[in-house]
Amino acid sequence: MKVKNLHIIQEVIANISRFILAAAFIFSGFVKAVDPLGFQYKIQDYLAAFGMASWFPSFFPLLGGIALSAIEFSIGIFLFFGVRRTVASTLALMLMSFMTPLTLYLAIFNPVSDCGCFGDAWVLTNWETFIKNVLLLLAAIGAFKGRKMLVRFISQKMEWLVSLYTLFFVFTLSFYCLDRLPVLDFRPYKVGKNILEGMTMPEGAKPSVYESVFILEKNGEKKEFTLENYPDSTWTFVDTRTVLKEKGYEPAIHDFSMIELNTGEDITEDVLTDMGYTFLLVAHRIEEADDSNIDLINEVYDYSVEHGYKFYCLTSSPEEQIELWKDKTGAEYPFCQMDDITLKTMIRSNPGLMLIKNGTILNKCCLLYTSDAADD
């Protein structure tokens, strides 16, 4: 009787662990699959933070991200239905064994602001991510130890069909969202959102408190100082960084600032309060932007001029790259400079087109390929 009860307990633990893992892996894989460019940017952040960006070819972050999201989603589906139980539980344990110490390092040293494990759908701090991964690691151990006890919801004869359909679905989803735009937009710039409202601080909300830290050098020794203990002029300035002292409320949109290139004027408020239509061509790195739809872009600009609408190209690229773009494309539209991360967040396309009116986003379209641009 005791042996039977112990077996039942082990089976219950294994299956509870299996469903916890399945939910986490399905959600994590799905939200990254619908936003392959967003996951690419996160992988690029990781590689840059660890000084490994030059180790891999340029296509690695994108294709690697698509592959990893497909693996996560497939593991989750397999665990949920009891398909490929040994393979799924082993891969889950391997992934969690790797990710748990990695996220501990991220939590301690903070080389990236967040791990990106759930994309933009659910942003966790690095410490929250580590705690989550510890729990998932325990679940992975439980599912792996009891892998033979995982209840099947699909017969062994049908395992190949579930496996094939799962992989087909997740890869098709990723490449569709890459060709178009994410079918689910978890960012503050999705269609229907008002940018100005997203920048507004609620009444009574306490803002975050930051402190400037100055790195100075004297006699070959580097030290960090604040404004309160800033030393005399015998120290040489090396670098500066901003440190978060006290976390407060942070608006969903906090780095949206349009600086017109020709005048250096901040035109953000003028654009966001304009009651007419405004076209925003978003190209976070103009030198890397796809130019296959240049004729369409110029047609939209001509249309906006003809009807009295505003048209701006937003980029983080330096002026010399903008001039090269003008020479190559014949662009006559005005340019504004903006933060690179903000531009990547606005639209998952380089370039992409956004239509706003009175600060409200009316439409967005991808300009990487003719399919989306022509339809919109």
Identify the residue ranges that each predicted region occupies.
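Functionalized membrane-embedded alpha-helices
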Residues: 11-34, 58-102, 143
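Short, internal strand/loop/helix patches
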Residues: 26, 311-314, 328-350
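Membrane-embedded alpha-helical segments of integral membrane proteins
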Residues: 97-150
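Internal/C-terminal transmembrane anchor helices
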Residues: 155-182
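Membrane-interface segments at or immediately adjacent to transmembrane helices
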Residues: 173-267
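Short active-site neighborhood of thiol/selenol oxidoreductases, capturing the structured segment around
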Residues: 271-288
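A short, hydrophobic beta-strand/beta-hairpin element that forms part of a small beta-sheet core
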Residues: 351-364
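Conserved small/polar residues in nucleotide/adenosyl-binding loops
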Residues: 369-375
